[in-house]
Amino acid sequence: CHLMAMFVDDGKAFGTTHMGGEGAQWAGMEPFVEKEHMFQNIGDGTFFHSGSLALRQAVAANSHLTYKILYNRAVAMTGAQDPDGGLDLPELTKYLKAEGVKKVIITTDDPSAYNSIEKSRWAKNQIIMHRDDIIEAQKELKAVKGVTVLIHDQSCAANLRRLRKRGLVHEPKERIFINEAVCEGCGDCGVKSNCLSVQPIKTEYGRKTQIDQPSCNKDYSCVDGNCPSFIKVIPSEKEDKRALPNINIKASKIPEPKKLNAKIGNIFMLGIGGTGVVTVNQIISTAAFLENKKVVALDQTGLCLLYTSDAADDSLRV
C-alpha cells in the first residue's frame, strides 16, 4: 500500500526499494546529502517479514530516520491475509524500544480502544494520538535525533468493506452524499480525506464532487472538509436481501457441453475486482484436477485486491 503512495503526483513520496530493505538506503545516503531527515513508509506485513532487520541496521548506523509503520493487519499484496509472525500493538512497542528506537508514537482513528489494555503491556512513556494529529506526531518525531517510529493503527479499509459485505463485522448505517447543487467543486473534502470514493463529476454547472457509494468505506473523514454540501442519510431499517433464484434442475439432466477436439484447452477470462473471475478460474481448475488433468493457471489481479474497479485477468490451460 505504501508503494502506491507514489502514484499520487505531488512529489511527497519517492524512491523504491526491495521488500524488507525499507530505510536501509537512507542509512547509506545520509552522510552525503544535505537533507537531514527522512520518513520511510512500511507495512506491518513487510515489517514482520523482513523489514525489522532494516530498522535494526538503521539503528546501528544511528540514522536520523522515522519509520511510518502502517499497522492494518492485512497483507494487501496477496489477498488481505493476517501478517505471519506479527506482534500485537503493545508487544510491538516493546520490541521497538528493545531494538533501540528513540521514540514511538501511535496514531489511530479510535484512541479509546486501548483503554482496556494494561499499561504494563506497553513500552514506557508510550504516546497515543488521534489520527487527526498525525502531522504534529510526525513533527515531534522528526525533532528527535536517531531512529523513531510512527505506528498508524487502522484496519485496512478495503478488507473492512469485504468483511461488512459478508456480515462478519458491524456496518455503520449512516451514508454520506454530496448535494451537487451546493457543491462548488473546491476539492477540500478530497484533500482532507485522501479518499478514492470522493470523485469528480461533470454537471451542466461545471465540475462538482460526488461520493461513490459502492466503494465508500464509511470512514466519514470527507466531512472534515469545509463545505455545506454534505448530506447525512440513514436508510430505512428494511433490509434489501436479494433472494437467489430458485433453479430446480437436476445435475443429471444438464446436457454435456460440446467437447473440443484439441488435447489442450486455453481459456482467458477478463473482468474487474469482485466479478468472480478468480473464483471461476479456481472452479474450472479444481474440476480439471479432479479429472486427473494437468492444469496451469495464472491470476493477474493487479490492484483489484484493493480497488474493485481495477482489472483482473485470468489465464487457464487444461
Cite the ranges covered by each PLM segment.
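Short glycine-rich or small-residue beta-strand-to-loop segments that form or flank ligand, phosphate
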Residues: 41, 178-179, 266-272
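Iron-sulfur cluster-binding cysteine motifs and their immediate structural context
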Residues: 154-155, 160-166, 184-240
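A short, basic/flexible loop-to-alpha-helix module at the beginning of a structural domain
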Residues: 248-264
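Glycine-rich phosphate/diphosphate-binding loop of Rossmann-like nucleotide-binding domains
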Residues: 277-297
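Conserved small/polar residues in nucleotide/adenosyl-binding loops
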Residues: 307-314
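Thiamine diphosphate
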Residues: 6-147
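Glycine/aspartate-rich loop-and-adjacent alpha/beta segment that forms the canonical ThDP
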Residues: 120-128, 136-194
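Short helix/loop capping segments that flank catalytic or ligand/cofactor-binding pockets
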Residues: 5-8, 49-51, 58, 76-79, ...
